[in-house]
A protein has these predicted regions:
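Conserved N-terminal structural module of periplasmic/extracytoplasmic solute-binding proteins
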Residues: 9, 20-128, 344, 359-366, ...
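Short helix-initiation/N-cap motifs at beta->coil->alpha
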Residues: 97-106, 201-207, 277-288
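Short, solvent-exposed loop/beta-turn-alpha elements that line the ligand-binding surface or hinge
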Residues: 140-152, 197-200, 220, 242-262, ...
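Glycine-centered hinge/linker elements that transmit conformational signals in sensory
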Residues: 212, 247-280
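Extracytoplasmic/periplasmic solute-binding protein
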Residues: 120, 161-173, 177-179, 187, ...
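Hinge/lid segment of periplasmic solute-binding proteins
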Residues: 36-58, 122-176, 206, 316
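Bacterial N-terminal signal peptides that target proteins for export
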Residues: 1-8
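Extracytoplasmic/periplasmic substrate-recognition and gating elements
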Residues: 306-381
């Protein structure tokens, strides 16, 4: 392999790949508009040593089917992962552009038609449904999971293991649903800062509910207040640390009778009954003082800071279930799938390894931080988005903390009867209704968990039986 030199300044020009779409979505697609500056990035001997002992894939091209191009366009930089893949491994990626509407049809057509396609973004439908459709190969023969670079990710990787094989090997986790709030508003209302509660291990459902009730009760005559808005249902249910569908490595089973899940659903009932939840869709933290907590992945934070210049915004992980030892969070795993019949298993595995290195090596993480803290401005110089260093640094601790556990539920990957996001109760998937039906209250949705569970439990049992027959 070529051994090239790099300069520190150029390393800091690299952009780190964004890992996933917002929680509740279906994929770990890359961020839009990947581009390269005029300066190429070269790598020193230490960097080129990352492929020691790996198969020689120099000259190979991976055909990647996706919505966004992994290669640079316009005038931005290559990602760290792509730079390593091209400069160390000597391989290339050719993107086959698709759309969100045709992505899965395009994948099936290319597989069935024998057209080249090697790599595909992990989608929540990938396992078990995509595997059972014959769309993917497992990665066991290509990735050495005993390599220390996978330390800290092993537990999550094991959760995705299906039929004894590793079809999904997440290289990073992102987009945890977090609670954004105004520290100024918290102080004005005489409430305890959620960050202080989190640091003391006291940020749980009880503290969350109590502060919202106080905030709403403090409303003046004629003032409308809500405790929370945003993406809450799934975050509440998954904060129990339990999934709707369990898998023991051989059989699936329904967990809809779980007492912990019932408590989460009863909490949603209470939020609705007390009118604490505002179902209005907000793209940023509301700046009118009407909402205390905004639940959303942090993609909004830069713009929310601009929209709330005097708010002193901060954020904390979603509160834990009372008595829980950890924070179980709704987030997205970034992973790439090896497509069925591909002869580029070694190359796809190498790219996955590059993504993992990009997410974990300190110099690349520092490069990502420097880019993240750059203000976004219009041509006229108006700031449209920014993060504070305090916000950024605290968010990074979530991905290394032993007290935070990312959640995964096979239920999202069991076909359209189980997962189908629509705005109609009768056509939504079971998972969608179970996660936030009691909050969203689309027409026809029962008002209680007991009724909702009873209406859909039979479908869960049927789907579980269907997939167990394939084991």
């Amino acid at each position: 392999m070529n051994k090239l030199r790099r300069t520190c300044a150029l390393l800091l020009a690299l952009s780190l790949t964004a890992a996933a779409t917002a929680c509740g979505g279906s994929s770990s697609s890359e961020s839009e508009g990947r581009t390269k500056s005029q300066d190429d990035v070269s790598l020193d001997t230490a960097d080129t040593a990352i492929n020691a002992g790996d198969p020689d894939i120099s000259g190979q091209t991976i055909y990647y089917l996706g919505i966004y191009d992994l290669n640079p366009t316009a005038n931005q930089d290559r990602t760290v992962a792509l730079t390593l893949f091209e400069d160390v491994y000597g391989a290339k990626i050719q993107t086959i552009k698709s759309t969100s509407e045709t992505l899965f049809t395009d994948l099936a057509n290319r597989i069935n038609g024998g057209e080249p396609v090697d790599m595909f973004d992990y989608q929540w439908d990938s396992v078990p449904n995509g595997v059972e459709k014959g769309q993917y190969e497992y990665l066991d023969d290509y990735i050495d999971l005993s390599d220390p670079i996978w330390d800290g990710m092993s537990e999550l990787i094991e959760k995705y293991k299906y039929k004894g094989h590793y079809y999904v090997v997440p290289y990073s986790v992102s987009d945890y649903i977090a609670i954004t709030y105004s520290r100024n508003l918290i102080e004005e209302e005489g409430l305890t800062d959620p960050y202080e509660l989190y640091q003391e291990g006291k940020w749980d459902w009880d503290a969350f509910m109590s502060s919202m009730k106080t905030f709403v009760a403090n409303a003046e005559d004629g003032e409308t207040r809500y405790g929370c808005a945003g993406w809450f249902g799934q975050a509440i249910v998954q904060s129990t640390g339990e999934s709707i569908i369990n898998y023991d490595g051989q059989k699936f089973s329904s967990n809809v009778m779980s007492g912990s899940i019932e408590k989460a659903e009863l909490m949603q009932e209470e939020l609705t009954r007390l009118n604490l939840f505002d179902s209005t869709w907000y793209g940023t933290y509301p700046n009118d003082g009407s909402v205390l907590y905004y639940g959303m992945a942090p993609w909004h934070l830069g713009q929310s800071n601009v929209m709330n210049p005097d708010g002193d915004l901060f954020l904390v992980p979603f509160p834990k279930m009372p008595g829980a030892d950890k924070y179980y969070l709704c987030g997205n795993a970034a992973a790439k799938m090896l497509v069925k019949n591909s002869d580029k298993g070694d190359a796809v595995a190498a790219y996955i390894k590059c993504e993992r290195l990009a997410a974990t090596k300190e110099e690349y993480k520092q490069a990502a931080k420097e880019k993240a803290l750059i203000e976004t401005k219009t041509a006229a110089g108006k700031v449209t988005s920014y993060l504070t260093e305090e916000q950024y640094d605290f968010m990074q601790t979530w991905y290394t903390s032993e007290d935070i556990v990312p959640m995964f539920d096979f239920g999202y990957g069991m076909g359209a009867r189980m997962a189908n996001e629509t705005y109609a109760y009768e056509t939504r998937g079971v998972m969608n209704n179970f996660m936030d039906g009691l909050l969203q209250q689309f027409e026809g949705t029962p008002a209680t968990w007991a009724e909702l569970r009873s209406a859909w439990q039979g479908v869960v049992d049927e789907v579980v039986e269907e997939f167990n027959a394939k084991q």
